[in-house]
Amino acid sequence: MKPYLKLETHPLANPENVIKGDKYRITVLTEHLLRLEYSEDGEFIDAASQTVVNRDFPAVEFSVKDTGDELELRTKYLQLNYNKKAFSANGLSCKTTAVGISSVPAWHYGDPTQDLGGTARTLDQVNGACELEPGIMSWFGSAVLDDSKSLLMTEDGWVTPRKKGVQDLYFFGYGWNFRLALKDFYHLCGKTPMLPRFALGNWWSRYWRYSEASYMKLMEDFDKENVPFSVAVIDMDWHRVDAVSYTHLTLPTNSR
């Protein structure tokens, strides 16, 4: 893949933010955002995925209490309890104390987060309201992004399937601070993809009495402003406009 087509990624997390066991790995991305991984063979994903491209958040202040059978991880706004086994409702929970949240019970693995919805993949055949995919914001203060099934990005810019059976979750515990949740989501997943400049060629057509020199200058001016063009049409001035007939061409000759 050509270099200019590759997505810039920073998938490696700050090692100071990582807590790792034989079959689990927890990454504290921010005081509100955790990455939760479980793998039976103890192999974890460091590559970017179709969804997550940047895990390079700064170091975060947190504490870990390990009783042998259970971990208790605390940040300023989150409390995670985990029994170090395969994720289950009894073994993995997280409570948030972020903005706007005071008495909401902890989230347990598998609980619906009752989020406010995300985006719709397509509007094909939609007539009116449509069902949205899960989002990262919730009146209950937390939401979960499950990245377990997305494809992984390769170093050459292509994609490859990930190994089955590995759980890869992102817990968002932002309370009602939706602006901060969206900001960190954009860092984690990258900005909204935009069409590249080379694919945005404009079509110029204006009914105007151009001369050859003025038309060339117009194109040069657009080029100086980095405005891309695919088509430039001379419009009506390729023929005489002061007569009924359209047969008298006024294009420059090909002698040059």
Region roles according to the model:
Residues 2-11:
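Short, Gly/Pro- and small/polar-rich lid/capping loops
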